[in-house]
């Protein structure tokens, strides 16, 4: 979480040049440590251009977190991979135009930010017209046996896959990152009043 907060001045700069795109704000609630139990959390992707990489992260090597966008326009999920050969770490942030808690979604516009932590690189689609989540499932995570619900927050498993038709770019526009595909399952924490069932009944 501290790493993501330290990147916020750069991320916020995207607001001014992003053509109306959503910039991922820090996620509150679930700490940036671990993901889902076992191998239920994962991220797979294929990058070309500025980065030649095919992340395939599972289980304990993956950290994830998520929540609702502050403006109520959808949800976001963040993934942090394991350290590379030189200590750099790759973070992906997905901003998805779907209501929190919606069980199933298809063809959802999505904004993606890719950050190389320790490498001073950031690429963003700067808008939701370049990438699309083809399918997405949101399912509430059960409480541990015998545990009582102590707050109005609920944890969800978010599983999605999709692709991009146009590349992400560096802040100065000099580099392009092509995201051929992505497939992930992570977590998000929502307040009761942020969930689809609550907002749709108003």
Enumerate the language-model features and the residues they cover.
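An ectodomain-focused feature that recognizes extracytoplasmic/extracellular
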Residues: 21-133
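C-terminal motif of bacterial Sec signal peptides marking the signal peptidase cleavage site
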Residues: 13-16
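Intrinsically disordered, low-complexity acidic/polar segments
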Residues: 54, 167-171, 193-195
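A periodicity- and composition-biased signal for non-globular, repetitive helical segments
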Residues: 8-9, 50
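Short, low-complexity, Pro/Ser/Thr/Gly-rich segments in the mature regions of secreted, periplasmic
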Residues: 185-202
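Surface-exposed beta-strand edges and their flanking turn/coil or helix-capping segments
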Residues: 92, 172-175, 197-199
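Acidic, glycine-rich flexible loop segments
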Residues: 106-188
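Bacterial N-terminal signal peptides that target proteins for export
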Residues: 1-8
């Amino acid at each position: 979480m501290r790493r993501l907060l330290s990147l916020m001045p750069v991320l916020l700069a995207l607001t001014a040049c992003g053509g109306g795109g959503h910039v991922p704000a820090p996620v509150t609630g679930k700490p940036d440590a671990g993901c889902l139990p076992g191998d239920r959390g994962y991220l797979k992707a294929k990058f070309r251009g500025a980065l030649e990489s095919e992340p395939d992260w599972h289980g304990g090597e993956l950290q994830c977190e998520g929540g609702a966008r502050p403006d109520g326009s959808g949800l976001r999920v963040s993934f942090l991979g394991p350290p590379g050969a030189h200590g750099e770490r790759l973070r992906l942030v997905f901003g998805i135009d779907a209501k929190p808690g919606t069980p199933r979604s298809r063809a959802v516009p999505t904004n993606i930010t890719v950050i190389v932590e320790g490498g001073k690189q950031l690429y963003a689609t700067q808008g939701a017209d370049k990438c699309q989540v083809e399918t997405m499932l949101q399912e509430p995570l059960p409480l541990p046996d015998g545990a009582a619900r102590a707050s109005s927050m609920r944890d969800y498993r978010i599983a999605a896959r999709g692709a991009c038709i146009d590349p992400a770019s560096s802040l100065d526009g000099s580099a392009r990152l092509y995201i051929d595909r992505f497939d992930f399952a992570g977590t998000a924490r929502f307040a009761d009043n942020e969930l689809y069932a609550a907002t749709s009944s108003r």
